[in-house]
């Protein structure tokens, strides 16, 4: 068993950083910084301080919630946080929680 951290980043799918979709830019940062792995989830509905986001078949564009999730040791998560803050600024929410990894190739 390894003590680790879960990093979750909540965005909207249309959020951009320097012309690139923010979730794609963040995934590049996580990979470049050696985070063990990450997954992007697309929600079907959500709300927060920036309003309600939901799928509407009659609209051509949608701005649904997107969650980026990764698990790694605390040292690696802390190392990447300043880079994430720089990209996300006021466009999202970052949550970090403790977890235990019981099996994982990169931790053995």
Swiss-Prot record:
The lineage's top-level taxon is Archaea
- The set of disulfide-linked cysteines is none
Q: Which residues cross the membrane?
A: none
Gene3D superfamilies, from UniProt? 3.30.70.120
Q: Which InterPro entries match?
A: N-reg_PII-like_a/b, N-reg_PII/ATP_PRibTrfase_C, UPF0166
Coiled-coil annotation: which residues?
Answer: none
Q: Which family does it belong to?
A: Belongs to the UPF0166 family.
Q: What is the protein's name according to its record?
A: UPF0166 protein MJ1524
Source organism per entry reads Methanocaldococcus jannaschii (strain ATCC 43067 / DSM 2661 / JAL-1 / JCM 10045 / NBRC 100440) (Methanococcus jannaschii)
């Amino acid at each position: 068993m390894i003590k680790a951290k879960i990093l979750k980043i909540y965005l909207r799918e249309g959020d951009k950083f320097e012309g690139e979709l923010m979730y794609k830019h963040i995934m590049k940062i996580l990979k470049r910084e050696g985070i063990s792995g990450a997954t992007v989830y697309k929600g079907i509905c959500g709300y927060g301080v920036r309003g309600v986001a939901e799928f509407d078949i009659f609209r051509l564009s949608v701005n649904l919630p997107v969650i980026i999730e990764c698990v790694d040791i605390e040292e690696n998560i802390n190392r990447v946080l300043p880079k994430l803050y720089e990209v996300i600024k006021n466009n999202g929410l970052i949550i970090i929680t403790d977890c235990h990894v019981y099996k994982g190739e990169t931790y053995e």
